[in-house]
């Protein structure tokens, strides 16, 4: 993954500075009397960047910079509306200029689930965090409808599976698979595809893990805050659970993740979601997806 990021093209510095200047002018046009500072907040594995706006009265906002033609903020806006209407806590859109790729958003803070977990919270707090995360996921899944988001179809799944031979085997390891090895891999991929595509389908965040879940301050907050959902699709119901419990950034004992999975399955059945009636079948789907 990090090797892939390292190959992403870097925009020339003068273009980045020009974009930042345009953002500053845009903010001033909306609130000429409001003094503020603008500072980088984060970036992801794309041309998209984020800035935190701190106003002189102490309030903060976040600006998404999604420069056309490299980025399109409209998919993000569509998913924001879908997930927000479902009751999930997503950033509020305060202003938008889709032609230039600027969005002014509410600020969900700096505390990701990852940073909260790295502080080694008590077991009860960890259990609450993951309970909140699965509750939010169930809200999103209950709102699912076909034909609204792109389908997580065979072509997309296969394209992601092919990252393994292309990026890991060939680029990272510097190896070339023999014809016999490739045939074995292709057979394995077909088994995986059959299992994944046979699952019940729901809205899928696609990056539902500890770096994209925000821990919000204050009592009664609708945790977690959910970000980075622009690539959401309609696909296998176990996908986001695998992202959450088999997180690339946080490692858990299998006994722990199995307990969380059972709790999710019980809540999902009560919510009327199309999970398998038998937990063993559901767990098998989850493992095939993993």
Each model region followed by its residue ranges:
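Active-site activation/catalytic loop segments of kinase-like enzymes and analogous catalytic loops
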Residues: 165-172, 237-275
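An alpha-helical support segment within catalytic cores of ATP-dependent transferases
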Residues: 23, 29, 145-151, 155-156, ...
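Long, amphipathic alpha-helical stalk/connector segments used for oligomerization, subunit docking
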Residues: 269, 275-286
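Short, positively charged and aromatic/hydrophobic N-terminal segments
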Residues: 4-9, 13-15
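ATP-binding pocket architecture of kinase catalytic cores
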Residues: 51-157, 163, 169-173, 197-198
